[in-house]
């Protein structure tokens, strides 16, 4: 039975994550869908009229909850590089091929999200007049497909910080066992979701930014899994 699953897990659907991403973009990027209302509704949970639930400079708390998860991802990436360079000294359940896939996928997801931010021209909640931003760095909230004035920010969509956490969705494509794949989905969603929620509570992102990031991570990981086929190898490959 294990072998019969290999062809399927090495050909994960790219249509489904692409459709989910398109749905998110359409729902939040167009007027009249309710997406803009939902974004503002979620932000209202963290905005008290004068500041965000988590201030921009939260001292040690920020270092722990913002830098901590990033440090964990860096350590994981270093571990993957070790497994790639020294597979004989690495856990047998990982193997070089899976380590290469995970490293490449995580890097590609983070790079894709950060590069897209430069062209989508979306502002963070902190940069909006409605949330107390002060001129000349104060803007109206414009949706993805709205025409933007010169100088409009382009540093929010998709979410860069959460992309590192959602990149762990790659774990779901590295093994063929259903229970392990489910574990990968949970790890990626929880890690990325926590990182995204923290940024929402700081006024650095809307819900839409975070959801789009998760969908992009899913799509990129699926594309790379079809190409690299990490699940179609033995535990020690």
State where each predicted segment sits.
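N-terminal transmembrane-helix/juxtamembrane module of multi-pass inner/ER membrane proteins
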Residues: 2-80, 118-125, 135-136
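Membrane-embedded catalytic cores of phosphoryl/pyrophosphoryl-handling enzymes
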Residues: 3-19, 139-237
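Aromatic-anchored segments of alpha-helical transmembrane domains
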Residues: 24-29, 108-114, 190-200
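Alpha-helical transmembrane spans of integral membrane proteins, capturing the lipid-embedded, hydrophobic core
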Residues: 71, 75-76, 102-111, 214, ...
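Alpha-helical membrane-inserting segments
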Residues: 77-81, 112, 116, 220-228
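Cytoplasmic juxtamembrane regions at transmembrane-helix boundaries
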Residues: 80-103, 170-189
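Membrane-interfacial segments
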Residues: 85-92, 119-128, 179-180, 227-236
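Membrane-interface loops
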Residues: 95-177
